[in-house]
Amino acid sequence: TQMSASDAIFAGFADIYIPKDTWPDLIKKLERSGDCSILDKEPINAGFSQLADHKQLLKTAFASKNLLKIVDFLSRSESKFANSAVNRIKKNCPLAMSYTIEMLSRLSPQSKIEEALDLEYRYTSRAQEYGNFQEGIRAAIIDKDRKPKWKIKINSVSKEMIDEFLKPV
């Protein structure tokens, strides 16, 4: 599932929305002028943001910083958005999802990129050892069945496992 432009802006991954059909003219203007401020002159509304619309639900769900609790909370919701989120979460590697939640809880907006990359490297180097990456590749690219068989289930991911993945290399 791709993130929409409006969700990317809401989440802070993007600053502005530029429709693809305007790119050629905009690129020419930028090449001629070299003035990036033209990007801000006519902001275009990116449309509806599901993340913004469900901000409180997500904030409450992810407050626990524990994948099993997040899935449990979202599963009890009667929201279509929450049910869709649970289905997407369950398709992903439980260990990678848990690690991501832990990494985000260890970092803050004031963290340096080096800190984030260090944590990412720690996990990535160890994920190879446990076969999660290989299983994801098998399901997505080799067999294309889109049905990975994760060795570790959501309910068996422990804090100790995550800490092991994130210890210094």
Predicted features along the sequence, with ranges:
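Long, low-complexity C-terminal extensions of enzymes
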Residues: 74-80, 89-169
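Generic preference for well-ordered secondary structure
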Residues: 10, 42, 54, 84, ...
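Residues at alpha-helix boundaries and the short loops/turns that link adjacent helices
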Residues: 2, 20, 64, 130-134
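Gly/Pro- and small hydrophobic-enriched strand-loop and loop-to-helix capping segments
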Residues: 3-26
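Amphipathic alpha-helical blocks and their helix-capping loop/short-beta junctions
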Residues: 18-92, 96
